[in-house]
Amino acid sequence: MKNKVAIIGKGNIGWAIKELLKDTYEIKQGDITEGFDARDINQVREFLKDVDAVISAGPFAINKNIGTVAAELNIGYFDLTEDVETTDFIRGIKSENVMMPQCGLAPGAINICAASLMKDFDHVSEAMMRVGALPRFTTNEMSYYLSWSTNGLINEYCNEADAIYEGKCIKVMPLEGAEKMIIEGESYEAFNTSGGCATMCETYENKVDNLSYKTIRYPGHLNHMKFLFNDLHLKKNKDVLEKLFDKEVPRTTNDVIIFFVKVIGEIDGILQEKTYLRKIYGDDRFSAIQRTTASGVCSCLEMYFKDQIPKKGFTKQESILWEDFTSNQFGKVYL
């Protein structure tokens, strides 16, 4: 008998998750466009009463209700959120089953990969996680088209980010910390955005010297965002900014994911570096952001049903083995 999985959210990522899982699991999917409102906790209780696990693929604001009910019903819980406050709430829920937020691309797969690379070192001087969800071709001044949740994008650009500096956890400002990158001969820029470190800063505080996550974009994007968010103070009017982006910034499925981890440290007394780089493209079925994000949470779900992750309580991304994550039919997209 197939395990029954509920997917809440039927947008681009929710659809992709269902497409990946439908041959292996019995799927039950709900969305506000079909009358299911996850903001109503009683509707959530009714929807989840007969499933083995739930994936939240909707806006992060609904995750608190879903996580609360998942714990009540003793079912596995997974989400994709980059929102730190929501993750802290999920962490505080007492459950006899797995509670695993942040199971997408970044946070998610990037943290699992970085933790795996760091294990090779006797001492880590610096761990750098860099991810970009980029259009393959752009002609606008932003050098950017939308390929995923506008709400999630704005949230990442507005909130403080976590990092480790000289062994201690710190907060850094979004849209700051700009750096130039050259990857396989092509120029990019990277800067601070929130959520990408997940829980790694608390895990590695006093264990590594420096650790950071930044978002990759084409050169010039950051200056335009600082003008909108800071100079025009639109970070205080997120609803206005979201409507503006959705109306005026084109959406694309012709995208590429740049997945980059670099770790510098000592191995047997010698300073060394190791890098993991993948460029992941879309195909006729999925865009690149759909493939990577949906595959991340689907791989975690598969590991859950194979008893490869703990079955009780809050589970950190960095506690997952990269070898297990990439060995199943979903996680192999990152190889």
Regions found by a protein language model. Give the residues of each.
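Conserved N-terminal Rossmann-fold NAD(P)-binding element of oxidoreductases
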Residues: 5-9
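Hydrophobic/small residue at the entry helix of a nucleotide-binding pocket
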Residues: 13
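NAD(P)-binding Rossmann-fold cofactor-contacting core
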Residues: 24-37
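Conserved Rossmann-fold cofactor-binding substructure of NAD(P)-dependent oxidoreductases
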Residues: 39-50
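N-terminal Rossmann-like NAD(P) cofactor-binding module of classical short-chain dehydrogenase/reductase
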Residues: 52-57, 78
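ADP-ribose/adenylate-binding Rossmann-like module
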Residues: 69-87
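Rossmann-fold NAD(P)-binding glycine/threonine-rich loop
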Residues: 81-101
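C-terminal catalytic/substrate-binding lobe primarily of soluble NAD(P)-dependent oxidoreductases
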Residues: 120-335
